[in-house]
């Protein structure tokens, strides 16, 4: 099948209906059939099960339980240098660099706006214009829990409705404004080096996006942007330490980080197309 046909079919496919159906099937307990699908998936995508807390495919009652499997203790040591921002996920670097004139690079020849990504909030986007961004793609074989790259306090969460195109490299190179048109959950944190956004982007067959404080954010979905504000002090403040889990995808997708101007410099290991490993150096706090 040609690349053009693959992209064209995505425009025609009822992506929300397909994704919700996949989500229901992935959460169903189907005994031997579930186990057979999990074993096929492990073989098809070369999933490294030796790192899982429970490496036995037959131990998972649903496909979703397998997909968001925990890793064994110590499988992903978190860099303990207080000036190092660590990778939030096992993934692959799609794009990274400066947010120039409010624009982020999606792929060669494609840009999109920080304001659109953040749900149309111009005031929020202004906090990141002139800063840095990084887009990390989680493939089907990756560990699909997302962690905190640094110590932070949750300020706001925004659900942004949208489409559910695939987010693989082929689609990123061919569908304009991909990450600003797909359904997403925007998490805004305050850190010692300024504001940081961690955006969880949905995609075809991603049955749900969850956070550790709100549980399942989507589905269900709605037609309007929804915003939750959180206290920055007091008993109800939500604080994270570097390396703590903050969310998860039930099937693969993308994480986008935005940083304020003059707050960080990316680690020299950062290159487009290079795999990332949770807990390893992502960036450094600017001196």
UniProtKB/Swiss-Prot annotation:
It holds the Pfam family PS_Dcarbxylase. Pathway: Phospholipid metabolism; phosphatidylethanolamine biosynthesis; phosphatidylethanolamine from CDP-diacylglycerol: step 2/2. The modification Pyruvic acid (Ser) is found at residue 253. Its EC number is 4.1.1.65. It is found in: Cell membrane. Transmembrane segments: none annotated. Its cofactor is pyruvate. The record marks 252-253 as: Cleavage (non-hydrolytic). Is synthesized initially as an inactive proenzyme. Formation of the active enzyme involves a self-maturation process in which the active site pyruvoyl group is generated from an internal serine residue via an autocatalytic post-translational modification. Two non-identical subunits are generated from the proenzyme in this reaction, and the pyruvate is formed at the N-terminus of the alpha chain, which is derived from the carboxyl end of the proenzyme. One of its GO terms (cellular component) is plasma membrane. Belongs to the phosphatidylserine decarboxylase family. PSD-B subfamily. Prokaryotic type I sub-subfamily. This is Phosphatidylserine decarboxylase proenzyme. It comes from Aliivibrio salmonicida (strain LFI1238) (Vibrio salmonicida (strain LFI1238)).
């Amino acid at each position: 099948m040609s690349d053009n046909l693959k992209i064209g079919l995505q425009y025609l496919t009822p992506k929300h209906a397909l994704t919700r159906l996949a989500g229901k099937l992935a959460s169903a307990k189907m005994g031997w059939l579930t186990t057979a699908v999990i074993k096929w998936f492990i073989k098809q995508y070369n999933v490294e099960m030796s790192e899982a807390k429970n490496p036995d495919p037959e131990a998972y009652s649903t496909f979703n339980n397998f997909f968001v499997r925990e890793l064994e203790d110590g499988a992903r040591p978190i860099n303990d240098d207080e000036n190092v921002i660590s990778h939030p996920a096992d993934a692959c670097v799609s794009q990274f660099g400066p947010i120039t004139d409010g624009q982020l690079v999606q792929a060669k020849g494609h840009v999109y706006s920080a304001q659109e990504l953040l749900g149309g909030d111009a005031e929020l986007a202004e906090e990141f214009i002139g800063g840095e961004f990084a887009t990390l793609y989680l493939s089907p074989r990756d560990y699909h829990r997302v962690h905190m790259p640094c110590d932070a306090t949750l300020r706001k969460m925004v659900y942004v409705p949208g489409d559910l195109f695939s987010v693989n490299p082929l689609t990123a190179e061919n569908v304009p404004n991909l990450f600003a048109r797909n359904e997403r959950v925007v998490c805004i944190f305050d850190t010692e080096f300024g504001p940081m956004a961690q955006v969880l982007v949905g995609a075809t067959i991603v049955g749900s996006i969850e956070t550790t404080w709100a549980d399942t954010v989507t589905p269900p979905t709605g037609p309007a942007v929804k915003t939750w504000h959180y206290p920055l002090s007091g008993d109800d403040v939500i604080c994270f330490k570097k390396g703590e889990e903050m969310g998860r995808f039930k099937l693969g997708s993308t994480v986008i980080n935005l940083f304020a101007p003059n707050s960080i410099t990316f680690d020299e290991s950062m290159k487009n197309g290079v795999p990332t490993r949770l807990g390893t150096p992502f960036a450094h706090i600017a001196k």
